[in-house]
């Protein structure tokens, strides 16, 4: 019997795309990107597990993929909020916001 497996992937939710139920969110994927050739020098933001312990990352180094924004429906989300990144790491948030603005206004 064939089975479809699903892989859990972390996202950084940026904002609500709309306020109707079910809600859509604009989100940035968080990935380990093991193949260095697949990393974008500027728009894959490295986050070290030791520097950001409250994000509960599973990998020593993960990347917030600024240039890979996706729309995620709340029905596809199954985990609770891991961390309030705005409150925990405001400097990281400022950097992410600047890169988002730069990338999406210059395409």
Sequence positions of predicted segments:
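Glycine-centered flexibility motif
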Residues: 1-3, 62
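Compact nucleic-acid interaction/catalytic patches
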Residues: 3-8, 13-51
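C-terminal terminal-subdomain/extension
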Residues: 46-107
């Amino acid at each position: 019997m064939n089975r479809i497996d699903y892989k859990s992937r972390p996202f950084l939710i940026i904002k609500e795309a709309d306020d109707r139920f079910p809600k859509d969110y604009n989100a940035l994927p968080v990935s380990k990107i093991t193949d260095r050739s697949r990393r974008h020098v500027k728009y894959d933001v490295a986050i070290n597990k030791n520097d950001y312990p409250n994000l509960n990352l599973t990998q020593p180094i993960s990347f917030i993929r600024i240039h890979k924004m996706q729309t995620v429906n709340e029905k596809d989300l199954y985990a609770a909020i891991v961390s309030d990144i705005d409150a925990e790491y405001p400097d990281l948030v400022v950097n992410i916001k600047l890169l988002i603005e730069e990338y999406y206004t210059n395409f």
